[in-house]
């Protein structure tokens, strides 16, 4: 049985985690929520001899999606996720970037995801769960065999993610 492993890499001035998930067998990887600092993410992948396969987005905030379009262009890889309810956020990444001093390009995923979908990394399959609240289109990725989840901002250390942002809902 192969496992999915994670390299946790904090990026952006917000220091949000941008995990690099990879298949132990194939060394193929997915960049999850590449908000920025792409040189750091690419360096971590190279240092671990990983083969970039795709980008996975949990939601459309600047610190999670701000570098996705640029990274996809640089590596000729596709973007999967989030749920289409976050379209308004992905369409405003440039303006979000201007507010926070980030360089960002608006983003259109190659594939929108919804509850029950599956995504692959190498030989492994992860389940997609729709978890709105932090944003209307927030999703998470779960690999049961590895007991590993990439949850974006649904959970913070010691609490739930913020829900008082545009489109958020505490319910």
Short names for language-model regions:
Residues 14, 61-64, 166:
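Alpha-helix N-cap/loop-to-helix initiation residues
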Residues 18, 41, 67, 91, ...:
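Short, function-defining helix-loop hinge/capping sites that tune catalysis or transport
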Residues 21, 33, 59, 71, ...:
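Divalent metal-coordination and catalytic microenvironments
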Residues 95-96, 118, 124-171:
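Metallo-beta-lactamase
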């Amino acid at each position: 049985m192969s496992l999915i492993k994670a390299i946790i890499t904090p990026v952006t001035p917000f220091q949000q985690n941008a995990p690099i998930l990879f298949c132990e067998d194939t060394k193929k990887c997915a960049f999850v929520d590449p908000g920025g600092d792409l040189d750091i993410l690419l360096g971590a992948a190279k240092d671990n001899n990983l083969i970039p396969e795709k980008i996975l987005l949990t939601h459309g905030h600047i610190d999670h999606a701000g570098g996705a379009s640029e990274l996809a262009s640089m590596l000729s890889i596709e973007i999967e996720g989030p749920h289409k309810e976050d379209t308004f956020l992905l369409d405003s990444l440039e303006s979000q970037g201007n507010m926070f001093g980030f360089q960002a390009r608006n983003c259109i995923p190659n594939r929108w995801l919804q509850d029950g979908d599956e995504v692959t990394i190498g030989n492994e399959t992860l389940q997609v769960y729709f978890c709105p609240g932090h944003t209307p289109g927030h999703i998470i990725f779960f690999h049961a065999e590895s007991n590993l989840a990439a949850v974006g901002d649904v959970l913070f250390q010691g609490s739930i993610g913020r829900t008082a942002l545009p489109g958020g809902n505490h319910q």
